[in-house]
Amino acid sequence: LVLSIGSRLSIRQVGYNYKTWARAAFVIVNDIDCEELKKPSVHVDMAVHADAGDLLERLDGELDAIFAEEGEKLPESISRPGLKQLFEGGEGLPGMNWSETCRMWKETYPVVQPKHWASGEMEPANVYAAIEAISSRLKENQITVVGNGSACVVGGHGYVIKKGQRFITNSAVAAMGYDLPAAIGAWTASRENRFYSQGTDRGGEDLVLVTGDGSIQMNLQELQTIIHHKMGIKIFLINNGGYHSIRQTQKNFFGEPLIGIGVDSGDLSFPDMEKLAAAYGYPYVKAEHNRELAEAVEKTLNTEGPVICEIFVSMDQNFEPKSSAKRLPDGTLVSPPLEDMAPFLSDEEMDRNMIIPRIR
């Protein structure tokens, strides 16, 4: 069963070979835009044309009715002792249910790996190590907003999410420059909107923004808005020398010469962030190597008010795992199903991890 509520289910979410997405699942899709329910890139077994809030309220009422009628008969939750379990989860790999299978995958294929922390003393920091260093230090109920590129992709992959936290991303629905306005909006909402506070002490916590050196340039003027209103927004800036998503695409499909990337293409550059921070009145912190990450993160989080922490990361670290084209022996490029991601597993290992028949 796949239940999608208020999501566009864009190509970025279902994969380029979209006909293979959720091919063995019963798919329920809710959207307020009826045209989104008709697009050919998503197969829909049950379409629900409704406001997401109305649907969730109705579902909540149905669940309350089930618990009122059958609550005493329901088993205790394995993952949350003391609470009742309404749904045990579907079948997983042999001998496991779906939840157990997911836990096994997380342990077998961790996003942040020892190799990401193993860079040499003088090598640039690794973006996966940086994301882990930032997220592992945050408190419960804290809000994180991420921008585009590495912040969005690696943040979505490797962020350590704790109880009550919000992770706000624009993946597949917005352009570069989303970061600063989104952080300002989330900061304001967290102090004024009951849906963000939800009875927590969220209003007393600083907000974290993780963004990139390219994305932040698109709405740079909003740095003044943050300073002017003394918003407690901690800005972690991932500096990968340009537009890293475009860099990977060009390297994977075309090779050199690179065009419109950054320092390695030679035709594009960004201003010095330390000087910009000073111009806007921000305290500035930086980390250039993995060994400096912990101290830089600690100093940033302990600085009162808004602050910018620039982290200089390697330009050679690709996003992983990622949906990527495969090159066949005859040179043909094909888009594999979404579950078959780069770096690609061997045929034997893929077969061991499949619950439904595999598409080769």
Can you describe what each PLM-predicted range is?
Residues 100-200:
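Active-site diphosphate/adenylate-binding microenvironment
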Residues 40, 49, 56-59, 154, ...:
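Thiamine diphosphate
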Residues 1-101, 297, 301:
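Glycine-rich, acidic loop regions that bind phosphate or pyrophosphate groups
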Residues 68-123, 312, 325-360:
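Conserved acidic/glycine
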Residues 4-5, 29-30, 48, 144-148, ...:
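General beta-strand structural signal in soluble alpha/beta enzymes
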